Amino acid sequence: MIRNIAIIGLGTMGPGMAARLARGGLQVVAYDVAPAAIERARSMLSVAETVLDALGIALPSAGVGTVRFTDDIGDAVSGADLVIENVPENISIKADVYRTIDGLIGQDTIVASDTSGIPITKLQAHISYPERMVGMHWSNPPHIIPMIEVIAGEKTAPQTVATIRDLIRSIGLLPVVVKKDVPGFVENRVLYALLREAVDLVERGVIDPEDLDTCVSWGIGYKIAVIGPMALLDMAGLDIYKSVSSFLNADLSNRDDVAPMVLEKTSASKFGIKSGEGMFCYTPEQTKALQAERARKLVAVRRILEGRE
């Protein structure tokens, strides 16, 4: 049974993951090599806890469900039943983490990667116990979005998948078991298909970025939040889908490289909110207000989808 969890690498996702796991009654030790990252995570943790309160997710019993921060990786993984690796999307960096913890963790400890899309089979090549390694892909923001993908690599034991699936369910979240270890898994493959088409339409001057966001948020997104793609096909009618896809599919973007617009912006260090400019511009004040507004709206939507409003 999993009770003690180590999170290796805090970044954007770590604090929210830690907060949600702790709210489920689990003991969490959160590690990062950078003191600044730990301090930032402490601040983000309190914000995440406020959001969890708004979601009505009850506090666990006294003495359980705690989060402790450390800059000592050995301390972090000592006694851990589950280690969640949450370092940057780079196989070499992840492999370094696996080599470091290899001799520090117990023989029954499960190692899960929060990779957004690196095949788990590739990561298993860098660990001594591939049968105990699994993908555990959270969606951002992790303390609000309840869906978590569970992905087996070629050498992952079925029991490892079952253990992580059951853990996710036990704390009130929604596990989705991905049956094949494809790059990007499921969520990001669907998302990046949408983003590729969206960027292409803006780049070709078909629509302005603001109008595209309105179209998707109040058109596709408004429906998809309630009706999944497969159910939407049934609602619209497979005969209609057959007819439209017979001529539209050939005209959709099928580029297999990075769009020039994205390359131009990233080469100018325009990364989005984190740099103050991307597709749109953001002041520090706007960023803070935007993050609060988005969290509030996501909480409201989730409560409605759960039938609590």
UniProtKB/Swiss-Prot annotation:
One of its GO terms (molecular function) is NAD+ binding. Optimum pH is 8.5. Its EC number is 1.2.1.100. InterPro entries: 3-Hydroxyacyl-CoA_DH-like, 3-OH-isobutyrate_DH-rel_CS, 3-OHacyl-CoA_DH, 3-OHacyl-CoA_DH_CS, 3-OHacyl-CoA_DH_NAD-bd, 3HC_DH_C, 6-PGluconate_DH-like_C_sf, 6PGD_dom2. The record marks H137 as: Important for catalytic activity. It catalyses: 5-formyl-3-hydroxy-2-methylpyridine-4-carboxylate + NAD(+) + H2O = 5-hydroxy-6-methylpyridine-3,4-dicarboxylate + NADH + 2 H(+); 5-formyl-3-hydroxy-2-methylpyridine-4-carboxylate + NADH + H(+) = 4-pyridoxate + NAD(+). NAD(+) binds at T12, M13, D32, V87, P88, E89, K94. Disruption phenotype: Disruption mutant cannot grow on a synthetic medium containing pyridoxine, 4-pyridoxic acid or FHMPC as a sole carbon and nitrogen source. It comes from the Bacteria. GO terms for biological process: fatty acid metabolic process; vitamin B6 catabolic process. Pfam families: 3HCDH (PF00725), 3HCDH_N (PF02737). Pathway: Cofactor degradation; B6 vitamer degradation. Optimum temperature is 55 degrees Celsius. Keywords: NAD, Nucleotide-binding, Oxidoreductase. PROSITE patterns: 3_HYDROXYISOBUT_DH, 3HCDH. Homodimer. Involved in the degradation of pyridoxine (vitamin B(6)). Catalyzes the oxidation of 5-formyl-3-hydroxy-2-methylpyridine-4-carboxylate (FHMPC) by NAD(+) to 5-hydroxy-6-methylpyridine-3,4-dicarboxylate (HMPDC). Can also catalyze the reduction of FHMPC by NADH to 4-pyridoxic acid. Belongs to the 3-hydroxyacyl-CoA dehydrogenase family. This is 5-formyl-3-hydroxy-2-methylpyridine 4-carboxylate 5-dehydrogenase.
